[in-house]
Amino acid sequence: MGRAKKVVLAYSGGVDTSVCIPYLKHEWGVESVVTLAVDLGQGAELEAIQAKALRAGAEQSLVREAVQTLIADYAFPAIQANALYEQRYPLSTALARPLIAQLLVEVAEEVGADAVAHGCTGKGNDQVRFDLAIAALNPKLKVLAPAREWGMTREETIAYGERYGIPMPVQKSSPYSIDLNILGRSVEAGILEDADQEPPEEVYALTRSIAQTPDEPAYVEIAFEEGIPVELDGQRLGPRALFERLNALAGSHGVGRIDMIEDRLVGIKSREIYECPALTVLIQAHRELESLTLTREVLHYKYGIETTYSQLVYNGLWYSPLREALDAFIRTTQKSVTGVVRMRLHKGQAVCVGRRSPYSLYNAELATYGEGDQFDHRAAEGFIYIWGLPTRTWAQVHRGSGA
């Protein structure tokens, strides 16, 4: 008996997911494989990917467009949360996985499949993200992961695919593993596995090297409404258009390159290269607007929430009660995060040079050291006395007694 009768496979057209089709049928006895390719703005030729899946033996090859959903339902909440895993990675790949899982489950229910499958190996984070998301959305569905079990080397995997007439896209001159969507691009493997080696320029595609960026900076004004970016330079844009324009502008100035050692959920450290031009600028601009509009107590408490939120998303717990609860808190904080932030993009740096909001808590008359100062300096002495009372009491007990 096969492991499942009908399987919906998350399909990218790459080596692993292409080989999964004949492997599921010939090695695991699956009767029917339906592939699902999701358009997340990666720029792939989806019609060619559909045709490739059918040639590889899929009964049906489907495509779902989900760029707007990825940005509006996943990236925008992450921007409101200032989500940066280990303070650096803006979760461009991690945010896409629960959406793909949701579409997998929807298609499986539509076509009457009893299982879904993905091409993740047993070493990465994506296997956890897919498996947990699917379990949360439909625990009755089986989850198959052939690449996690087949035990083939890369060369053996390619040879297996060629045996079934599948054209292999990987060339020996391009050893990198790449993931791309409209939120960003991630690269690993090859020379990048040596943590002491500078990444060659060929690794990058969305951002220019500093040497190739313009000598003159670019300025962009980003308008937010309740923490959501809605305008660039006074022009209201939809989510996709906003990301496309800002990716191009920031990337041309070298903004958004990340070279980091990150801690994977499975317990290993991994060297990753990310390019996230728009996300990098938007999170930084959003933080600047929050500093203007949120109270000190909310701002400081939210810092801890942001770390937890980033870890949840990275660790595959998007569909969890805690993530939903954190989103509810964050949405409440965003009611006054409306305004405009002016960013300067230059030589790989995105720097805030101005911010304004109708809900600004910044009062120049209280902050100034010049004429018009309305701060009551006489109140400082009493404030310091009360604020320091616990410290003085402790000192009298411990210092005064000679302890």
Curated annotation (Swiss-Prot):
This is Argininosuccinate synthase. It catalyses: L-citrulline + L-aspartate + ATP = 2-(N(omega)-L-arginino)succinate + AMP + diphosphate + H(+). Pfam families: Arginosuc_syn_C, Arginosuc_synth. It is an enzyme of class 6 (ligase). It comes from the Bacteria. L-aspartate binds at residues 121, 125-126. ATP binds at residues 10-18, 119. CDD domains: ASS. InterPro entries: Arginosuc_syn_C, Arginosuc_syn_N, Arginosuc_synth, Arginosuc_synth_CS, Arginosuc_synth_type_1_subfam, AS_cat/multimer_dom_body, Rossmann-like_a/b/a_fold. Homotetramer. Belongs to the argininosuccinate synthase family. Type 1 subfamily. It is found in: Cytoplasm. Pathway: Amino-acid biosynthesis; L-arginine biosynthesis; L-arginine from L-ornithine and carbamoyl phosphate: step 2/3. HAMAP family: Arg_succ_synth_type1. The gene is argG.
